[in-house]
Protein backbone atom coordinates (compact mmCIF):
# COMPACT_ATOMS: atom_id res chain seq x y z
CA UNK A 1 0.00 0.00 0.00
CA UNK A 2 3.03 2.29 0.44
CA UNK A 3 3.23 2.92 -3.32
CA UNK A 4 -0.47 3.78 -3.58
CA UNK A 5 -2.20 7.03 -2.68
CA UNK A 6 -3.89 6.72 0.67
CA UNK A 7 -7.59 7.42 1.05
CA UNK A 8 -9.04 10.07 3.32
CA UNK A 9 -10.08 7.34 5.77
CA UNK A 10 -6.58 5.87 5.95
CA UNK A 11 -5.01 9.28 6.51
CA UNK A 12 -7.41 10.08 9.32
CA UNK A 13 -6.92 6.70 11.03
CA UNK A 14 -3.21 6.33 10.23
CA UNK A 15 -4.10 2.78 9.25
CA UNK A 16 -4.40 0.55 6.19
CA UNK A 17 -7.98 -0.11 5.08
CA UNK A 18 -8.61 -2.99 2.67
CA UNK A 19 -11.50 -4.96 1.21
CA UNK A 20 -10.67 -8.68 1.28
CA UNK A 21 -12.56 -11.96 0.96
CA UNK A 22 -12.80 -12.02 4.74
CA UNK A 23 -14.44 -8.58 4.78
CA UNK A 24 -13.16 -5.11 5.53
CA UNK A 25 -9.87 -4.98 7.44
CA UNK A 26 -8.33 -2.05 9.31
CA UNK A 27 -4.67 -2.58 10.25
CA UNK A 28 -3.15 -0.27 12.87
CA UNK A 29 0.48 -0.13 14.00
CA UNK A 30 0.53 -0.50 17.79
CA UNK A 31 3.29 2.03 18.17
CA UNK A 32 1.07 4.69 16.52
CA UNK A 33 -2.10 4.16 18.56
CA UNK A 34 -2.94 4.52 22.23
CA UNK A 35 -4.37 1.03 22.71
CA UNK A 36 -2.78 -0.64 25.74
CA UNK A 37 -4.94 -3.73 26.19
CA UNK A 38 -6.79 -5.63 23.43
CA UNK A 39 -9.85 -5.78 25.65
CA UNK A 40 -10.30 -2.04 25.21
CA UNK A 41 -11.20 -2.63 21.54
CA UNK A 42 -13.98 -5.12 22.30
CA UNK A 43 -16.44 -2.27 22.76
CA UNK A 44 -16.50 -2.05 18.95
CA UNK A 45 -18.27 -5.41 18.84
CA UNK A 46 -21.21 -4.08 20.83
CA UNK A 47 -22.44 -1.83 18.00
CA UNK A 48 -24.05 -3.41 14.93
CA UNK A 49 -23.89 -6.91 16.44
CA UNK A 50 -25.14 -8.45 13.17
CA UNK A 51 -21.75 -7.54 11.65
CA UNK A 52 -19.20 -10.30 12.17
CA UNK A 53 -16.15 -8.69 13.81
CA UNK A 54 -12.74 -9.99 14.80
CA UNK A 55 -9.97 -8.13 16.61
CA UNK A 56 -6.44 -9.55 16.44
CA UNK A 57 -3.81 -7.91 18.63
CA UNK A 58 -0.14 -8.78 18.07
CA UNK A 59 3.05 -7.24 19.35
CA UNK A 60 3.18 -4.94 16.30
CA UNK A 61 -0.34 -4.61 14.89
CA UNK A 62 -3.99 -4.38 15.73
CA UNK A 63 -6.11 -5.89 12.93
CA UNK A 64 -9.85 -5.30 12.99
CA UNK A 65 -11.87 -7.38 10.49
CA UNK A 66 -15.53 -6.52 9.84
CA UNK A 67 -17.85 -8.67 7.73
CA UNK A 68 -21.31 -7.12 7.11
CA UNK A 69 -24.18 -9.27 5.73
CA UNK A 70 -23.68 -10.25 2.07
CA UNK A 71 -26.69 -8.18 0.95
CA UNK A 72 -25.07 -4.93 2.13
CA UNK A 73 -23.40 -2.75 -0.49
CA UNK A 74 -20.44 -0.39 -0.34
CA UNK A 75 -21.06 3.36 -0.63
CA UNK A 76 -19.79 3.43 -4.25
CA UNK A 77 -22.81 1.40 -5.39
CA UNK A 78 -25.06 4.32 -4.50
CA UNK A 79 -24.04 5.93 -7.81
CA UNK A 80 -26.18 3.39 -9.71
CA UNK A 81 -29.34 4.19 -7.75
CA UNK A 82 -32.13 6.46 -8.97
CA UNK A 83 -32.35 10.08 -7.81
CA UNK A 84 -35.00 9.51 -5.17
CA UNK A 85 -33.03 6.63 -3.61
CA UNK A 86 -29.94 8.85 -3.40
CA UNK A 87 -31.85 11.56 -1.55
CA UNK A 88 -33.44 9.00 0.80
CA UNK A 89 -30.02 7.54 1.57
CA UNK A 90 -28.66 11.03 2.28
CA UNK A 91 -31.60 11.68 4.63
CA UNK A 92 -30.94 8.49 6.60
CA UNK A 93 -27.21 9.22 6.69
CA UNK A 94 -27.87 12.60 8.32
CA UNK A 95 -30.20 10.96 10.84
CA UNK A 96 -27.64 8.27 11.67
CA UNK A 97 -24.97 10.86 12.44
CA UNK A 98 -27.38 13.15 14.32
CA UNK A 99 -28.68 10.29 16.50
CA UNK A 100 -25.27 8.83 17.36
CA UNK A 101 -24.95 9.15 21.16
CA UNK A 102 -22.35 6.60 22.26
CA UNK A 103 -19.75 8.62 24.09
CA UNK A 104 -16.96 6.04 23.88
CA UNK A 105 -17.34 5.44 20.11
CA UNK A 106 -16.40 8.20 17.71
CA UNK A 107 -17.64 8.53 14.12
CA UNK A 108 -15.71 9.05 10.92
CA UNK A 109 -18.08 9.77 8.01
CA UNK A 110 -15.94 8.77 5.03
CA UNK A 111 -17.43 6.92 2.00
CA UNK A 112 -15.00 3.99 2.47
CA UNK A 113 -16.36 3.54 6.00
CA UNK A 114 -20.04 3.33 4.97
CA UNK A 115 -22.21 0.46 3.69
CA UNK A 116 -25.99 0.36 3.18
CA UNK A 117 -28.69 -2.29 3.20
CA UNK A 118 -31.59 -2.86 0.79
CA UNK A 119 -33.65 -0.30 2.68
CA UNK A 120 -30.93 2.32 2.00
CA UNK A 121 -30.06 2.49 5.71
CA UNK A 122 -26.39 3.45 6.17
CA UNK A 123 -24.01 1.66 8.59
CA UNK A 124 -20.50 2.60 9.67
CA UNK A 125 -17.83 -0.09 9.55
CA UNK A 126 -15.24 1.38 11.90
CA UNK A 127 -15.68 3.46 15.03
CA UNK A 128 -12.92 5.13 16.96
CA UNK A 129 -12.58 4.13 20.61
CA UNK A 130 -11.94 6.91 23.08
CA UNK A 131 -8.26 7.04 24.14
CA UNK A 132 -7.60 3.68 22.40
CA UNK A 133 -8.22 3.56 18.60
CA UNK A 134 -8.46 6.54 16.20
CA UNK A 135 -10.39 8.72 16.05
CA UNK A 136 -9.84 9.19 19.77
CA UNK A 137 -12.06 12.18 20.41
CA UNK A 138 -15.51 13.36 19.37
CA UNK A 139 -14.91 16.14 16.80
CA UNK A 140 -18.28 17.68 15.96
CA UNK A 141 -16.94 20.08 13.29
CA UNK A 142 -15.00 17.36 11.44
CA UNK A 143 -17.97 14.99 11.49
CA UNK A 144 -20.34 17.75 10.30
CA UNK A 145 -18.14 18.64 7.31
CA UNK A 146 -17.61 14.95 6.47
CA UNK A 147 -21.36 14.35 6.64
CA UNK A 148 -22.17 17.17 4.20
CA UNK A 149 -19.45 16.04 1.79
CA UNK A 150 -20.69 12.42 1.92
CA UNK A 151 -24.30 13.53 1.33
CA UNK A 152 -23.24 15.71 -1.62
CA UNK A 153 -21.24 12.80 -3.07
CA UNK A 154 -24.24 10.46 -2.74
CA UNK A 155 -26.68 12.89 -4.38
CA UNK A 156 -24.45 14.58 -6.98
CA UNK A 157 -21.40 12.37 -7.51
CA UNK A 158 -19.72 14.71 -9.99
CA UNK A 159 -16.60 15.21 -7.83
CA UNK A 160 -14.51 13.19 -5.39
CA UNK A 161 -15.32 13.11 -1.67
CA UNK A 162 -12.34 15.27 -0.70
CA UNK A 163 -13.29 17.88 -3.34
CA UNK A 164 -16.66 18.35 -1.64
CA UNK A 165 -14.94 18.35 1.74
CA UNK A 166 -12.11 20.82 1.08
CA UNK A 167 -12.96 22.95 -1.96
CA UNK A 168 -16.47 24.23 -1.37
CA UNK A 169 -15.33 27.83 -1.87
CA UNK A 170 -13.22 27.28 -5.00
CA UNK A 171 -14.92 24.62 -7.15
CA UNK A 172 -18.21 25.11 -8.97
CA UNK A 173 -20.69 22.47 -7.81
CA UNK A 174 -24.25 21.79 -8.90
CA UNK A 175 -27.02 23.74 -7.20
CA UNK A 176 -28.08 20.65 -5.24
CA UNK A 177 -24.55 19.88 -3.99
CA UNK A 178 -23.93 23.54 -3.18
CA UNK A 179 -27.13 23.73 -1.12
CA UNK A 180 -26.08 20.66 0.90
CA UNK A 181 -22.57 22.01 1.55
CA UNK A 182 -23.95 25.40 2.63
CA UNK A 183 -26.37 23.94 5.20
CA UNK A 184 -25.72 25.32 8.72
CA UNK A 185 -27.42 22.70 10.90
CA UNK A 186 -28.72 19.14 10.92
CA UNK A 187 -32.31 20.38 10.84
CA UNK A 188 -31.62 22.65 7.87
CA UNK A 189 -29.96 19.79 6.03
CA UNK A 190 -32.82 17.38 6.77
CA UNK A 191 -35.38 19.95 5.64
CA UNK A 192 -33.47 20.55 2.39
CA UNK A 193 -33.27 16.84 1.64
CA UNK A 194 -36.94 16.29 2.53
CA UNK A 195 -37.94 19.10 0.12
CA UNK A 196 -36.16 17.36 -2.74
CA UNK A 197 -37.74 14.02 -1.84
CA UNK A 198 -41.21 15.61 -1.81
CA UNK A 199 -40.60 17.21 -5.21
CA UNK A 200 -39.50 13.89 -6.70
CA UNK A 201 -42.55 12.12 -5.23
CA UNK A 202 -44.89 14.78 -6.62
CA UNK A 203 -43.27 14.46 -10.01
CA UNK A 204 -43.49 10.66 -9.86
CA UNK A 205 -47.27 10.91 -9.38
CA UNK A 206 -47.56 12.43 -12.84
CA UNK A 207 -46.11 9.25 -14.36
CA UNK A 208 -47.70 5.85 -14.84
CA UNK A 209 -45.45 3.13 -13.48
CA UNK A 210 -45.52 -0.23 -15.24
CA UNK A 211 -43.29 -3.31 -14.91
CA UNK A 212 -40.14 -3.21 -17.06
CA UNK A 213 -41.13 -6.42 -18.86
CA UNK A 214 -44.52 -4.96 -19.78
CA UNK A 215 -42.86 -1.71 -20.84
CA UNK A 216 -40.43 -3.59 -23.11
CA UNK A 217 -43.31 -5.54 -24.67
CA UNK A 218 -45.28 -2.36 -25.31
CA UNK A 219 -42.20 -0.61 -26.67
CA UNK A 220 -41.44 -3.40 -29.15
CA UNK A 221 -45.10 -3.53 -30.18
CA UNK A 222 -44.98 0.23 -30.75
CA UNK A 223 -41.80 -0.05 -32.79
CA UNK A 224 -43.37 -2.84 -34.81
CA UNK A 225 -46.43 -0.73 -35.53
CA UNK A 226 -44.22 2.15 -36.61
CA UNK A 227 -42.31 -0.15 -38.96
CA UNK A 228 -45.61 -1.34 -40.44
CA UNK A 229 -47.08 2.14 -40.63
CA UNK A 230 -44.13 3.71 -42.44
CA UNK A 231 -44.78 1.85 -45.74
CA UNK A 232 -48.49 2.60 -45.41
CA UNK A 233 -47.73 6.27 -44.80
CA UNK A 234 -45.37 6.36 -47.78
CA UNK A 235 -48.01 4.73 -49.97
CA UNK A 236 -50.63 7.20 -48.73
CA UNK A 237 -48.36 10.13 -49.54
CA UNK A 238 -47.63 8.64 -52.95
CA UNK A 239 -51.32 8.11 -53.63
CA UNK A 240 -52.20 11.62 -52.46
CA UNK A 241 -49.52 13.53 -54.34
CA UNK A 242 -48.76 11.30 -57.33
CA UNK A 243 -51.15 8.42 -57.99
CA UNK A 244 -54.38 10.38 -57.51
CA UNK A 245 -53.37 13.36 -59.72
CA UNK A 246 -52.10 10.94 -62.36
CA UNK A 247 -55.34 8.97 -62.30
CA UNK A 248 -57.33 12.20 -62.64
CA UNK A 249 -55.11 13.28 -65.56
CA UNK A 250 -55.81 9.97 -67.32
CA UNK A 251 -59.56 10.41 -66.81
CA UNK A 252 -59.42 14.00 -68.13
CA UNK A 253 -57.30 13.00 -71.15
CA UNK A 254 -59.71 10.17 -72.00
CA UNK A 255 -62.63 12.62 -71.96
CA UNK A 256 -60.68 15.03 -74.18
CA UNK A 257 -59.77 12.23 -76.60
CA UNK A 258 -63.40 11.17 -77.00
CA UNK A 259 -64.21 14.81 -77.79
CA UNK A 260 -61.31 14.88 -80.31
CA UNK A 261 -59.57 17.58 -78.29
CA UNK A 262 -56.13 16.21 -79.16
CA UNK A 263 -54.12 19.22 -77.95
CA UNK A 264 -55.87 18.93 -74.57
CA UNK A 265 -54.87 15.24 -74.38
CA UNK A 266 -51.23 16.17 -75.05
CA UNK A 267 -51.07 18.99 -72.50
CA UNK A 268 -52.85 16.95 -69.80
CA UNK A 269 -50.37 14.06 -70.05
CA UNK A 270 -47.25 16.10 -70.85
CA UNK A 271 -45.58 15.68 -67.44
CA UNK A 272 -45.99 11.88 -67.26
CA UNK A 273 -43.46 9.41 -68.62
CA UNK A 274 -45.00 7.54 -71.55
CA UNK A 275 -43.92 4.10 -70.32
CA UNK A 276 -45.66 4.67 -66.97
CA UNK A 277 -49.04 5.09 -68.70
CA UNK A 278 -51.44 2.21 -69.51
CA UNK A 279 -51.28 0.98 -73.12
CA UNK A 280 -54.74 2.31 -73.90
CA UNK A 281 -53.66 5.77 -72.73
CA UNK A 282 -50.42 5.45 -74.73
CA UNK A 283 -52.57 4.73 -77.79
CA UNK A 284 -54.70 7.83 -77.20
CA UNK A 285 -51.64 10.02 -76.64
CA UNK A 286 -49.83 8.66 -79.72
CA UNK A 287 -52.95 9.17 -81.85
CA UNK A 288 -53.24 12.74 -80.55
CA UNK A 289 -49.65 13.50 -81.58
CA UNK A 290 -50.29 12.02 -85.04
CA UNK A 291 -53.42 14.15 -85.39
CA UNK A 292 -51.77 17.43 -84.40
CA UNK A 293 -48.59 16.74 -86.38
CA UNK A 294 -48.58 18.37 -89.80
CA UNK A 295 -48.35 15.08 -91.73
CA UNK A 296 -51.08 15.47 -94.30
CA UNK A 297 -54.44 13.74 -94.27
CA UNK A 298 -53.34 10.76 -96.39
CA UNK A 299 -50.33 10.00 -94.27
CA UNK A 300 -52.26 10.50 -91.02
CA UNK A 301 -54.95 8.09 -92.21
CA UNK A 302 -52.30 5.57 -93.29
CA UNK A 303 -50.62 5.71 -89.86
CA UNK A 304 -53.86 5.38 -87.90
CA UNK A 305 -55.11 2.50 -90.06
CA UNK A 306 -51.91 0.46 -90.20
CA UNK A 307 -49.47 1.44 -87.45
CA UNK A 308 -51.19 3.10 -84.48
CA UNK A 309 -54.10 0.85 -83.55
CA UNK A 310 -55.16 -0.76 -80.30
CA UNK A 311 -53.73 -4.05 -81.60
CA UNK A 312 -50.32 -2.52 -82.42
CA UNK A 313 -47.07 -3.19 -80.63
CA UNK A 314 -46.88 -0.55 -77.84
CA UNK A 315 -43.49 0.46 -79.24
CA UNK A 316 -45.39 2.19 -82.05
CA UNK A 317 -47.20 4.30 -79.43
CA UNK A 318 -43.94 5.19 -77.70
CA UNK A 319 -42.37 6.15 -81.04
CA UNK A 320 -45.03 8.71 -81.83
CA UNK A 321 -45.10 10.05 -78.27
CA UNK A 322 -41.31 10.59 -78.31
CA UNK A 323 -41.55 12.04 -81.81
CA UNK A 324 -44.33 14.42 -80.78
CA UNK A 325 -42.42 15.52 -77.68
CA UNK A 326 -39.33 16.32 -79.74
CA UNK A 327 -37.33 13.45 -78.25
CA UNK A 328 -36.06 12.37 -81.66
CA UNK A 329 -33.07 10.34 -80.46
CA UNK A 330 -35.39 8.09 -78.44
CA UNK A 331 -37.72 7.86 -81.44
CA UNK A 332 -34.80 6.80 -83.67
CA UNK A 333 -33.87 4.12 -81.12
CA UNK A 334 -37.43 2.74 -81.14
CA UNK A 335 -37.44 2.75 -84.96
CA UNK A 336 -34.29 0.62 -84.91
CA UNK A 337 -35.87 -1.80 -82.44
CA UNK A 338 -38.89 -2.16 -84.71
CA UNK A 339 -36.56 -2.37 -87.77
CA UNK A 340 -38.88 0.02 -89.57
CA UNK A 341 -36.90 2.21 -91.95
CA UNK A 342 -39.65 4.80 -92.43
CA UNK A 343 -39.66 5.49 -88.68
CA UNK A 344 -35.87 5.79 -88.64
CA UNK A 345 -35.83 8.07 -91.69
CA UNK A 346 -38.65 10.29 -90.47
CA UNK A 347 -37.13 10.77 -86.97
CA UNK A 348 -33.64 11.32 -88.42
CA UNK A 349 -34.97 14.06 -90.69
CA UNK A 350 -36.59 15.84 -87.73
CA UNK A 351 -33.50 15.35 -85.59
CA UNK A 352 -31.40 16.92 -88.34
CA UNK A 353 -33.68 19.97 -88.43
CA UNK A 354 -33.36 20.22 -84.67
CA UNK A 355 -29.56 20.17 -84.86
CA UNK A 356 -29.50 22.75 -87.67
CA UNK A 357 -31.50 25.14 -85.49
CA UNK A 358 -28.74 25.04 -82.89
CA UNK A 359 -25.21 26.48 -83.02
CA UNK A 360 -23.57 24.58 -85.87
CA UNK A 361 -20.21 26.13 -84.95
CA UNK A 362 -20.17 23.85 -81.91
CA UNK A 363 -17.83 20.95 -82.63
CA UNK A 364 -19.98 18.33 -80.87
CA UNK A 365 -23.14 19.44 -82.69
CA UNK A 366 -21.31 19.37 -86.01
CA UNK A 367 -20.10 15.82 -85.37
CA UNK A 368 -23.62 14.75 -84.45
CA UNK A 369 -24.95 16.46 -87.58
CA UNK A 370 -22.44 14.62 -89.78
CA UNK A 371 -23.45 11.33 -88.17
CA UNK A 372 -27.14 12.07 -88.78
CA UNK A 373 -26.48 12.98 -92.43
CA UNK A 374 -24.66 9.69 -92.91
CA UNK A 375 -27.53 7.73 -91.36
CA UNK A 376 -30.07 9.66 -93.40
CA UNK A 377 -28.30 8.75 -96.63
CA UNK A 378 -28.16 5.12 -95.59
CA UNK A 379 -31.84 5.06 -94.56
CA UNK A 380 -32.89 6.80 -97.76
CA UNK A 381 -30.96 4.28 -99.85
CA UNK A 382 -32.60 1.34 -98.05
CA UNK A 383 -36.02 2.92 -98.52
CA UNK A 384 -35.38 3.33 -102.24
CA UNK A 385 -34.49 -0.36 -102.50
CA UNK A 386 -37.57 -1.50 -100.56
CA UNK A 387 -40.01 1.08 -101.97
CA UNK A 388 -41.97 -1.37 -104.12
CA UNK A 389 -42.47 -4.05 -101.45
CA UNK A 390 -43.42 -1.51 -98.75
CA UNK A 391 -45.55 0.82 -100.90
CA UNK A 392 -48.75 0.07 -99.02
CA UNK A 393 -47.40 0.91 -95.59
CA UNK A 394 -44.87 3.53 -96.59
CA UNK A 395 -44.87 6.38 -94.13
CA UNK A 396 -43.21 8.92 -96.43
CA UNK A 397 -44.08 9.09 -100.14
CA UNK A 398 -41.88 10.49 -102.91
CA UNK A 399 -43.43 13.95 -102.93
CA UNK A 400 -43.04 14.20 -99.17
CA UNK A 401 -39.42 13.10 -99.42
CA UNK A 402 -38.83 15.99 -101.79
CA UNK A 403 -40.62 18.34 -99.37
CA UNK A 404 -38.42 17.14 -96.50
CA UNK A 405 -35.31 17.50 -98.66
CA UNK A 406 -36.32 21.05 -99.53
CA UNK A 407 -36.90 21.81 -95.84
CA UNK A 408 -33.49 20.43 -94.98
CA UNK A 409 -31.87 22.50 -97.72
CA UNK A 410 -33.66 25.59 -96.48
CA UNK A 411 -32.50 24.89 -92.93
CA UNK A 412 -28.93 24.34 -94.14
CA UNK A 413 -29.02 27.53 -96.22
CA UNK A 414 -30.39 29.47 -93.28
CA UNK A 415 -27.66 28.09 -91.03
CA UNK A 416 -25.02 28.99 -93.63
CA UNK A 417 -26.41 32.52 -93.98
CA UNK A 418 -26.41 32.99 -90.23
CA UNK A 419 -22.84 31.72 -90.04
CA UNK A 420 -21.73 34.06 -92.86
CA UNK A 421 -23.50 37.00 -91.21
CA UNK A 422 -21.79 36.23 -87.92
CA UNK A 423 -18.39 36.05 -89.62
CA UNK A 424 -19.03 39.34 -91.48
CA UNK A 425 -20.04 41.02 -88.23
CA UNK A 426 -16.91 39.74 -86.52
CA UNK A 427 -14.73 41.07 -89.37
CA UNK A 428 -16.36 44.51 -89.19
CA UNK A 429 -15.87 44.66 -85.43
CA UNK A 430 -12.23 43.64 -85.80
CA UNK A 431 -11.68 46.29 -88.50
CA UNK A 432 -13.31 48.93 -86.33
CA UNK A 433 -11.07 48.03 -83.40
CA UNK A 434 -7.98 48.38 -85.60
CA UNK A 435 -9.13 51.80 -86.82
CA UNK A 436 -9.78 52.93 -83.24
CA UNK A 437 -6.34 51.76 -82.18
CA UNK A 438 -4.78 53.62 -85.14
CA UNK A 439 -6.58 56.84 -84.22
CA UNK A 440 -5.53 56.49 -80.59
CA UNK A 441 -1.90 56.04 -81.65
CA UNK A 442 -2.04 59.12 -83.90
CA UNK A 443 -3.42 61.22 -81.04
CA UNK A 444 -0.61 60.12 -78.75
CA UNK A 445 1.97 60.98 -81.43
CA UNK A 446 0.44 64.46 -81.88
CA UNK A 447 0.65 65.10 -78.14
CA UNK A 448 4.31 64.10 -78.13
CA UNK A 449 5.03 66.51 -81.05
CA UNK A 450 3.30 69.36 -79.22
CA UNK A 451 5.50 68.82 -76.19
Curated annotation (Swiss-Prot):
InterPro entries given in the database record: T7SS_EssB, T7SS_EssB_C
Biased amino acid composition, Basic and acidic residues: 376-386, 406-451
Positions of region (Disordered): 376-451
Classification via Pfam families: YukC (PF10140)
Biased composition (Polar residues): 387-397
Principal localisation: membrane
Stretches of the chain forming a coiled coil according to its record: 362-447
UniProt entry tagged with the keyword Nucleus: no
Superkingdom, taxonomy of origin: Bacteria
Transmembrane segments: 221-241
Keywords, in A-Z order: Cell membrane, Coiled coil, Membrane, Transmembrane, Transmembrane helix
Membrane topology: Single-pass membrane protein
GO cellular component, one term: plasma membrane
Phenotype reported upon loss of the gene: Cells lacking this gene are blocked in YukE secretion. They display an increased bacteriophage SPP1 resistance phenotype. Loss of delivery of LXG toxins to target cells.
Cell compartment(s), UniProt: Cell membrane
Family statement drawn from the similarity comment of this UniProt entry: Belongs to the EssB family.
Function according to Swiss-Prot or TrEMBL: Required for YukE secretion. Probable component or regulator of the ESX/ESAT-6-like secretion system (BsEss). Required to deliver LXG toxins to target cells.
Protein name: ESX secretion system protein YukC
Organism: Bacillus subtilis (strain 168)
Amino acid sequence: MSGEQKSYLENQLEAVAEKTDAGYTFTFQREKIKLLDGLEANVIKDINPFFHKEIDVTDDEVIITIQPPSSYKAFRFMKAKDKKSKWQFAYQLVQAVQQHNLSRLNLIVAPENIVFDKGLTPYFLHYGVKESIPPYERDEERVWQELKAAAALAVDGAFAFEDYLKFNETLTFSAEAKAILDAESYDDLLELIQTHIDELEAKAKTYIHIPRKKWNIQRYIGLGLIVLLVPALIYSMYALFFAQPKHQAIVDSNRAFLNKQYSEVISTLSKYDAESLPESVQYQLATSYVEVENLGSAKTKNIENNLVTLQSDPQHFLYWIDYGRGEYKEAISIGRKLEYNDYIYFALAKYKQQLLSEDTNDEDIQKELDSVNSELEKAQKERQENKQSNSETSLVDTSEEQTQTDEEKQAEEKAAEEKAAAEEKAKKEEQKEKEDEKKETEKKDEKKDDK
